[in-house]
Amino acid sequence: MPGDPTATAKGNEIPDTLMGYIPWTPELDSGEVCGIPTTFKTRDEWKGKKVVIVSIPGAYTPICHQQHIPPLVKRVDELKAKGVDAVYVIASNDPFVMAAWGNFNNAKDKVVFATDIDLAFSKALGATIDLSAKHFGERTARYALIIDDNKIVDFASDEGDTGKLQNASIDTILTKV
């Protein structure tokens, strides 16, 4: 992961970037409508909140789709019971793909599936991964970020393209919130 290793230091302010998403509505459950993408500014959206942001290299990819995100969605209430106000899953995929994947995972309004537009947020954290050798290009890395009022509480990543899920897993996140 390139970038400044101090960017994710505890107490640092998060990057102020734009993210895209499609707000969940019950109409999306049918799969017959796709919703309308909108954007939010990270510092505005997360001001005054304790938030868990989980980044993945791509929706519907093996580790993300089979091991990482389904347990997170199923256990989101455990995070909320520990004082977490909001949970976001971010990736470089477009808002339509992220919304469809959130719908597939039955996330409804419990977890927001958002697009890290131009990888700006993850790049500012030094948390991207080059998957060009697999024809995916540069992607958001697999990481978990816990913030409180826009300040970093904890950052943990699963380094490289190892296919291993550990530091960004729901089990690990629950020990840190």
Curated annotation (Swiss-Prot):
GO BP, one annotated term: cell redox homeostasis
Matching Pfam families: Redoxin
InterPro entries: PRX5-like (IPR037944), Redoxin (IPR013740), Thioredoxin-like_sf (IPR036249), Thioredoxin_domain (IPR013766)
One Gene Ontology cellular component: peroxisome
GO molecular function annotation: thioredoxin peroxidase activity
Keywords, comma-separated and alphabetical: Allergen, Antioxidant, Disulfide bond, Oxidoreductase, Peroxidase, Redox-active center
Note, other: The active site is a conserved redox-active cysteine residue, the peroxidatic cysteine (C(P)), which makes the nucleophilic attack on the peroxide substrate. The peroxide oxidizes the C(P)-SH to cysteine sulfenic acid (C(P)-SOH), which then reacts with another cysteine residue, the resolving cysteine (C(R)), to form a disulfide bridge. The disulfide is subsequently reduced by an appropriate electron donor to complete the catalytic cycle. In this typical 2-Cys Prx, C(R) is provided by the other dimeric subunit to form an intersubunit disulfide.
Subunit structure: Homodimer; disulfide-linked, upon oxidation.
Family classification: Belongs to the peroxiredoxin family. Prx5 subfamily.
Protein name: Putative peroxiredoxin
Organism: Malassezia furfur (Pityriasis versicolor infection agent)
